[in-house]
A protein has these predicted regions:
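Detector for Asparagine
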Residues: 2, 31-33, 68
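A short, polar/charged loop-to-alpha-helix boundary motif
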Residues: 78-82
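A short, surface-exposed beta-strand/turn
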Residues: 49-75
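Short, non-transmembrane alpha-helical segments in secretory-pathway proteins
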Residues: 1-28
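Exposed beta-strand-loop-beta-strand "reactive/processing" segments of non-cytosolic proteins
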Residues: 26-59
Length: 82
């Protein structure tokens, strides 16, 4: 399975689990146990937009893109990204 297939398979389960749409997927990496995926999710909308609060999540996926575990790595303001 390639990175694009992992993203397509994992995204519906991630959306269901978080009850939110990820803003972006910042990384997908293969490892010996499967895959690790990082994504940013809007936690709190603000004005101006640069003050939006995002959570960065890490998902540990098996070889078939099923979620084994996840955690919040950090919270960031949109203006701090990049």
């Amino acid at each position: 399975m390639n990175v694009l297939e992992i993203q397509r398979k994992a995204l519906p389960e991630i959306k269901e689990m978080l009850r939110k749409e990820p803003e972006s997927i910042s990384s997908i990496e293969k490892n010996e146990n499967g895959w690790t995926l990082h994504c940013e999710v809007l936690e709190k909308k603000a004005i101006p937009e640069t003050y939006d609060l995002l959570k960065v999540y890490e998902f540990i996926l098996d070889h078939d893109a099923k979620i084994n575990s996840f955690k919040v790595l950090r919270k960031i303001r949109r203006g701090d990204v990049g």
